[in-house]
């Protein structure tokens, strides 16, 4: 009995910084152009402006522009809008759970667990944005590892996000003790080549 090649699932993580560029302009369409250029199936986003009194927010806009489903995990309010992490997916989202990673008086942080129904298997994707203080990150890394290692959640798991940490920092070392690390250097080189060949964002509007 022969089996065909295993399907490839392209996953990206992207801190969009409220969709604001270096020019100070808030342009979700430019974020959508980058995501479109890398042709990602699933994208974990951080620092996303969500729904507010006058609109549905950037996660909804990006989902509509890219034709992707989305879920958001607000951590706090920002000028009347929810603010936090979001996940975009071309595949059905089977389940969405949130975990509080906040520590003491530091900025509120939440983690998403998004179960992606990809072909015949479910991928458990964990989207995180760790804090900027070292003790805060240590607490969050320990809690994150405990959540991800829950044996009641079977199947493949992937932790992505903005760790606010060096590759060999305290938080990443703590996580590496419990989880397998993926060497991203080759993928980053590919990503750079894709962006170099992508059309200007202005032309992608």
Residue ranges: model-predicted function:
Residues 1-42, 64-65, 69-205:
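Active-site regions of metal-assisted phosphoester/phosphodiester hydrolases
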Residues 19, 46-52:
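Active-site neighborhood of divalent metal-dependent phosphoester/pyrophosphate hydrolases
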Residues 23, 53-54:
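Membrane-interface helix caps and helix-loop-helix hairpins in membrane proteins
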Residues 51, 57-59:
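Membrane-embedded segments
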């Amino acid at each position: 009995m022969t089996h065909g090649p295993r399907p490839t699932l392209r996953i990206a993580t992207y801190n969009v910084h409220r969709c604001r560029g270096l020019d100070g302009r808030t342009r979700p369409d430019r974020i959508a152009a980058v995501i479109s250029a890398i042709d990602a199936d699933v994208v974990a986003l951080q620092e996303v402006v969500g729904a507010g009194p006058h609109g549905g927010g950037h996660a909804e806009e990006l989902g509509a522009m890219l034709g992707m489903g989305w879920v958001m995990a607000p951590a706090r309010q920002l000028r009347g809008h929810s603010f936090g992490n979001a996940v975009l997916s071309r595949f059905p989202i089977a389940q969405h759970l949130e975990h509080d990673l906040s520590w003491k008086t530091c900025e509120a942080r939440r983690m998403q667990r998004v179960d992606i129904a990809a072909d015949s298997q479910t991928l458990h994707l964990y989207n995180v944005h760790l804090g900027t203080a070292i003790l805060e990150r240590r607490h969050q890394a320990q809690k994150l590892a405990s959540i991800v290692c829950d044996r009641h959640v079977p199947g493949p798991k992937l932790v992505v996000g903005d760790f606010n940490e060096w590759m060999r920092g305290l938080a990443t070392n703590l996580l590496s003790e419990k989880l397998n690390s993926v060497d991203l250097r080759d993928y980053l080189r590919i990503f750079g080549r894709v962006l170099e060949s992508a059309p200007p964002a202005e032309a992608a509007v």
